[in-house]
């Protein structure tokens, strides 16, 4: 009866009813509309940005377009495959997916190719794989599993042991390590530590999303404060001792603050940073943009097709379309919250919100960099920027969210354990 009521609510929530007649498109109708829109936008802007790399014969732009269309097609197929699996499958597969992506991310430091001084890619000949993207995705799925398994005792279970190592042999501290720290915190710490040397902002993203999921899952606020303190201390030490890409981090932060010291108009054009070129692109775009394919700044920005896609999009299509694009990402998160609140299974709800947050927070970081409100991160615009692994992982994440929404609609989202079932509104912090 409860599932029928939820189905009725979902069907009458202003979602495009025409899609409900399409048998393959069960689940959240809004997401089924949003995702193809983002993919079409991606094809348009990646094609236009590719003119920067064009040759006199024009072959490079066309080849770049076809390559990106193939990536979009593969991503679409991956989304549909992910959509067909049930939440129980993802719960069972989470440990294996996590360990596999962890191993690949470690391997990249030994056999991978470097970009901008950081080992990030494994070259398979026909495809360049970025394992850190897989690890981001699998960590969120694994965290949803671990937190849901702890729901019976989550409000009383301590996750952070004493800061005094001498006490760790005490029975109470051993219990904290075995039941809280090892199953919940260590996987996140491992993911962040392995990603950090090559892609600092991705490690930050994984950590932030994981803490947010802990908050939603009702982890004790005392533990959340301790985790926050540990993160601040660890990050400070990382930068202080010059580990990994800490020099690059310091340089980017320094560039971010120095950009505002000298007025943009008083700088020689050949001394402008990519972010400053992005600001000019946004200014030139104005309300309606300069028109598709008419960008000037794409020739000035190092990676208009990835790192500064939002600025490039605003230049060609204007602020109005940029606001539309922003609303799409915001709506993905809103729909995930809707799915979460209609889920009776804590794992599935955390899965939807965690994956949606991974997409939307990454989009937010990308946009903040483009408007010079945050230091350069190298994060691309999900499902829009050029990038095979990122596109594939984003599509899988959205496919999983759609799978959860489909099961809610079908009434087949049944918790594997009664302890993982929502019983009252106080079972979560969302």
Regions found by a protein language model. Give the residues of each.
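Hydrophobic alpha-helical scaffolding
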Residues: 23, 243, 267-268, 299, ...
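Transmembrane helix boundary and interhelical junction motifs in multipass membrane proteins
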Residues: 199-204, 289-294, 304-306, 374-377, ...
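Short linear Ser/Thr-Pro motifs
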Residues: 39, 48-50, 201, 295, ...
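A juxtamembrane structural motif centered on a specific transmembrane helix
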Residues: 1-19, 147, 362-430
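Extracytosolic (periplasmic/ER-lumenal) interhelical loops and adjacent juxtamembrane/interface segments
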Residues: 272-291
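Hydrophobic alpha-helical transmembrane segments of multi-pass inner membrane proteins, especially
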Residues: 32-48, 55-271, 311-372, 396-400, ...
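Long extracytoplasmic/lumenal interhelical loops at the membrane interface
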Residues: 286-320
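Cytosolic juxtamembrane amphipathic/interface segments immediately preceding
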Residues: 12-26, 59, 166-170
